[in-house]
C-alpha cells in the first residue's frame, strides 16, 4: 500500500528528513524558518530597505517570489530554450515599495537569479534548503486560498462550486514536494487528476512512449496521494480502481467527482500549517531570536507567539478596510481559509467575517494601480487564544467514518458539532450507482446517510491561553450552532488568475 509511510509528522515532510524525534523535528523546522529570516534580512540590506519598508508585506511577497523564481529549474530551463521578447531568463524581480516624501512609490527591481540563489544558500548554510522554498510556496498558497474563489476552475473540470472547501492548495506549484502534497485538499487532487485524464482523452500520445511511461508513474503517484487522504475503506478501494485503470477516461472522471462529493461528508485528511511571510521570520532573527536553538513547530503555539510580537504593515487601497485586510492575512497565516468562522472568531478574539462581507481585495498590488492614493496600515495579526492545527479532516472518530464538517475543512483541533443539512448534500448523489464501482458507491452513500450531524468532532479538544505553551488547560468553546460558519457563503471574491 503506497500510503504507508505518509503518517510521519508533517514537519518532517517540511524538512525532507528521515524519522526524527520531536526535539530534532523542532530544531530542523527552526533551522528552516531561521534560514528564511536570514535570507530576508540580507535582501533588505541589498535593497537598502528601511525598517518600515522591510515590514511591508507586499515587499516580503516580492522577495519571496524572486527566490522561488530563481530556484524554479523547470521554468528557467524552458525560458532559456524559448526566449520570449523582453524577458531575460537569467533575471528575476518585481515591485518594491518605498516611502518617499510621505508617499508610497513603486520601484521595479531586477536581479540575477544566480545572485539570489547565492544569497539564499548563504543564509541556509550553503544548502539549497528546498524545505524553506516549499514553506514559502505554502504561505503563498494559503494566501490565495483566503483571497480568491475557484468556482471557475471547479466548473471547468465538471465539479460543483459547492466543493470549494475541498480546494486547499489548488494554486501550489507542482514542485512543492511531499510537504505540498500533505496540504492539498481532496478537491485539488481530484482536479489535478481530471485535468490529466482529459489530456489523455484529447491527446492520443499522452500515455504512450517514454514520456507516457513517466506520465503514468505521475498519475499513479497522484492517485496514491489522494487515496492516502481518504479515511474509509470504500473510498480507498475506489481510488485503487481509478489508479489501476488501463486507459483512464470518462468513467474515472465520474468516479473522481463522486469521491470529491463524498468528501464533503466523509472528510479527507488534509494537513494545515501556519506558514508566515518571510518578513516575520526576518524580524525575529534580526531581534536576536535563534530559531534552531529554541526549536519551532508549524502546528503548535510558535506561529501564534511570533505573530503576537511582530508588527507587519500592508498597503491599503483607498476604499479598503484595514481590519478586513488584517483578517485576510490572519487567515492566510494560519491556513484557516476553510475553517469554521465561529472557531476562527473564538481563537482570534474578534469576529471573523465571511468573505462576501469583506471590503478588501488581494494583498498584492497590480502594476497598473495608482500609487498616488495608496496608504499603509498595521496588520492586526494577534490572537486571543491558540489551538493545535489538525490534519485529520475533523471526523468525529477515526474508526468508523463519520460526518466531517460540511463546507469547512477544519484547521484547528477544537471541539465543535457539525451543523449540516444532510439532504442538500445527499441530493448530489441521486441515481448513479451502477458501473464497475457500484458496490463501493453504494457503501459510501450508506455511510454518508448514517453520518450523524449531531456528532461532536475533536471531542474534548479546546483552545489554549497564550501563556499555556504546554497545552495543559484546554478551554472548550461552546458555539452557537444555528448557522453554518463557512467563509465562502455569499461570496463575491475575484477568481484566481495565474
Swiss-Prot record:
**Mainly resides where?**
virion
Listed GO molecular functions? RNA binding; structural molecule activity
Q: Which GO terms describe its biological process?
A: symbiont entry into host cell; viral penetration into host nucleus
Example of a GO cellular component annotation carried by this entry: ribonucleoprotein complex
Q: What family does the Swiss-Prot or TrEMBL record give for this protein? A: Belongs to the influenza viruses nucleoprotein family.
Protein keywords: Capsid protein, Helical capsid protein, Host nucleus, Host-virus interaction, Ribonucleoprotein, RNA-binding, Viral nucleoprotein, Viral penetration into host nucleus, Virion, Virus entry into host cell
Residue window of motif Bipartite nuclear localization signal: 198-216
The residue numbers the entry assigns to motif Unconventional nuclear localization signal are 1-18
- Keyword RNA-binding in record: yes
Q: Which Pfam families match?
A: Flu_NP
Question: Would the keyword Transmembrane be found if you checked this record's keyword annotation?
Answer: no
Ranges for the region named Disordered are: 1-22
Cellular localisation: Virion; Host nucleus
What the protein does comes down to:
Encapsidates the negative strand viral RNA, protecting it from nucleases. The encapsidated genomic RNA is termed the ribonucleoprotein (RNP) and serves as template for transcription and replication. The RNP needs to be localized in the host nucleus to start an infectious cycle, but is too large to diffuse through the nuclear pore complex. NP comprises at least 2 nuclear localization signals that are responsible for the active RNP import into the nucleus through cellular importin alpha/beta pathway.
Q: How is it modified after translation?
A: Late in virus-infected cells, may be cleaved from a 56-kDa protein to a 53-kDa protein by a cellular caspase. This cleavage might be a marker for the onset of apoptosis in infected cells or have a specific function in virus host interaction.
Assembly = Homomultimerizes to form the nucleocapsid. May bind host exportin-1/XPO1. Binds to viral genomic RNA. Protein-RNA contacts are mediated by a combination of electrostatic interactions between positively charged residues and the phosphate backbone and planar interactions between aromatic side chains and bases.
Official protein name in the record:
Nucleoprotein
In which domain of life is the source organism classified?
Viruses
Amino acid at each position: 500500500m503506497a500510503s504507508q509511510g505518509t503518517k510521519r509528522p508533517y514537519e518532517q515532510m517540511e524538512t525532507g528528513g528521515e524519522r526524527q524525534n520531536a526535539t530534532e523535528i523542532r530544531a530542523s523546522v527552526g533551522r528552516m524558518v531561521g534560514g528564511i529570516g536570514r535570507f530576508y534580512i540580507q535582501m533588505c540590506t541589498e535593497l537598502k530597505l528601511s525598517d518600515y519598508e522591510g515590514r511591508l508585506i507586499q515587499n516580503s511577497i516580492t522577495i519571496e517570489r524572486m527566490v522561488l523564481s530563481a530556484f524554479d529549474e523547470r521554468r528557467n530551463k524552458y525560458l532559456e530554450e524559448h526566449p520570449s521578447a523582453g524577458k531575460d531568463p537569467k533575471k528575476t524581480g518585481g515591485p518594491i515599495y518605498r516611502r518617499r516624501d510621505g508617499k508610497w512609490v513603486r520601484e521595479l527591481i531586477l536581479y540575477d537569479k544566480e545572485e539570489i540563489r547565492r544569497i539564499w544558500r548563504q543564509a541556509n548554510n550553503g544548502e539549497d534548503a528546498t524545505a524553506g522554498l516549499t514553506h514559502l510556496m505554502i504561505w503563498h498558497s494559503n494566501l490565495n486560498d483566503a483571497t480568491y474563489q475557484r468556482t471557475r476552475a471547479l466548473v471547468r473540470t465538471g465539479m460543483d462550486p459547492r466543493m470549494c472547501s475541498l480546494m486547499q492548495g489548488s494554486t501550489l506549484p507542482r514542485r512543492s514536494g511531499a510537504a505540498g502534497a500533505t496540504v492539498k485538499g481532496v478537491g485539488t487532487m481530484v482536479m489535478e487528476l481530471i485535468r490529466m485524464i482529459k489530456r489523455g482523452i484529447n491527446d492520443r500520445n499522452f500515455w504512450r512512449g517514454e514520456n507516457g511511461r513517466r506520465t503514468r508513474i505521475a498519475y499513479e503517484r497522484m492517485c496514491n496521494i489522494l487515496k492516502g487522504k481518504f479515511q474509509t475503506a470504500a473510498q480507498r478501494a475506489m481510488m485503487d480502481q481509478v489508479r489501476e485503470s488501463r486507459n483512464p477516461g470518462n468513467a474515472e472522471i465520474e468516479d473522481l467527482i463522486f469521491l470529491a462529493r463524498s468528501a464533503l461528508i466523509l472528510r479527507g485528511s488534509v494537513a494545515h500549517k501556519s506558514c508566515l511571510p518571510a518578513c516575520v521570520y526576518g524580524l525575529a532573527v534580526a531581534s536576536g531570536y535563534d530559531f534552531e536553538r529554541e526549536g519551532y513547530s508549524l502546528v503548535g503555539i510558535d506561529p501564534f507567539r511570533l505573530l503576537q510580537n511582530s508588527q507587519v504593515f500592508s498597503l491599503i487601497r483607498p476604499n479598503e478596510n484595514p481590519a478586513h485586510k488584517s483578517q485576510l492575512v490572519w487567515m492566510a497565516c494560519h491556513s484557516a481559509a476553510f475553517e469554521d468562522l465561529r472557531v476562527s472568531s473564538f481563537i482570534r478574539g474578534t469576529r471573523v467575517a465571511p468573505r462576501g462581507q469583506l471590503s478588501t481585495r488581494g494583498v498584492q498590488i497590480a502594476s497598473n494601480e495608482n500609487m498616488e492614493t495608496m496608504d499603509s496600515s498595521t496588520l492586526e495579526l494577534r490572537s486571543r487564544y491558540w489551538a493545535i492545527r489538525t490534519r485529520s479532516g475533523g471526523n468525529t472518530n477515526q474508526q468508523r467514518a463519520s460526518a466531517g464538517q460540511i463546507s469547512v475543512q477544519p484547521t484547528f483541533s477544537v471541539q465543535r458539532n457539525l451543523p449540516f443539512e444532510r439532504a442538500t448534500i445527499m441530493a448530489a448523489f441521486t441515481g448513479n450507482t451502477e458501473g464497475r464501482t457500484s458496490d463501493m458507491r453504494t457503501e459510501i452513500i450508506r455511510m454518508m446517510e448514517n453520518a450523524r450531524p449531531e456528532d461532536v468532532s475533536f471531542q474534548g479538544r479546546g483552545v489554549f491561553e497564550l501563556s499555556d505553551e504546554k497545552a495543559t488547560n484546554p478551554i472548550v468553546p461552546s458555539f452557537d450552532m444555528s448557522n453554518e460558519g463557512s467563509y465562502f457563503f455569499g461570496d463575491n471574491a475575484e477568481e484566481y488568475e495565474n
